[in-house]
């Protein structure tokens, strides 16, 4: 075996990962080399990247254009049995158990696929704080997958690489599939599986890059809260005075838009931790949606798409131009790029002090929630566990009716511990830092229109500059929320949602309907004492 060194780091031995007769190891290659490798003329199928007019390479991830949660499994053993939030008949989630025998079969499949090949190895970090980060090693035979990992994880210095020992290994065998899946009781021939005792992730059958990124996020979500460190699916930014704000929200709530603020530096856009030193990014890059992207609407993301960025599943015309509006393959078109492709970021390390503002974003299509309300610690836990948003979905008769979404901790798909653990740790961190929490509705009200981005930005500004603390408040029944009666630069007539209806009884009827949905959803968290104690902090029906 030869090791092509692109650093001064020591030679690495892959036999300890079960790999044999490896022809060559290309470790932490430069972006220049990755560009040459992923665009080679002799590559075929999903391995080959196409150069676009913006300079970024575009790849096709095949039939998987998103994560495959039905194919996600975790080895149930002495390490995981007690703490893992396992799926059950009562509460379904993505943490499905497999035994060691099935794991061994899948590991043999992947190691056989990768053995005897020329391999790319990317060593990097998940977590900007050296005390709590995971040292990640990703092994793949596909150049663009190595590129994706180099973009998304934190890139080590040459000195760090010289003594690098992985805490967690990801072996990506995208080209192999499992023909024994039925007899093993699995969902399909494709798999994304984790063994926390061996600290290894195996991938087979899916080429989607996000399986590697979100796989490690799920692991951080397991290890950190057990050390009383918050692990969060959120964006974070920092003001000129060093004040830190974190934004939770599901897709479509404005998380990216509102945390990208010319007055504030970005810490990160998706995954963060909060420990004794403050808030820190898990990642060294961004993984942004590109559907309907335009330079005018989102200049930061558009300008980040240049050489070293990696596009997934976008339509590239024969002249190299990109049709960002084309969602025919998937609406989940993406681009990964290193964080430094964004100008206004926290440097040199993506971390800040303790957060003093925590913002839950919800796009309420029911027209019930106020545009902003300040939460008590118990309400903070309740709404964090609820993770509510709603969308307007057209029916066959052209009527639009709201569809609610509840996602625990605004990221249920990535949780590996019971959701109440994340709420408990978050509020503990907030109380120690004196942080305040706010529920911000970026959705609709009784006028039938969406709350304007100008009003929402005014609300966010009032939260961040503290002026909301000086506002007089009033009580909103059913949901038991305290709302300000006026804020600078915000239309006062929208702050009490009842005032946006011709008849306040309309609001009350809708509020009771939504409250019932909240109550029914929260019932699944009352299987422990912490969850039961929070019921009183949610909406109440007589």
Swiss-Prot record:
The lineage of its organism: Bacteria, Pseudomonadati, Pseudomonadota, Gammaproteobacteria, Vibrionales. It is found in: Cytoplasm. The gene is pckA. It comes from Vibrio campbellii (strain ATCC BAA-1116). ATP binds at residues 214, 233, 249-257, 298, 334, 450-451, 456. Pfam families: PEPCK_ATP. It catalyses: oxaloacetate + ATP = phosphoenolpyruvate + ADP + CO2. HAMAP family: PEPCK_ATP. GO terms for molecular function: ATP binding; metal ion binding; phosphoenolpyruvate carboxykinase (ATP) activity. GO terms for biological process: gluconeogenesis. This is Phosphoenolpyruvate carboxykinase (ATP). It comes from the Bacteria.
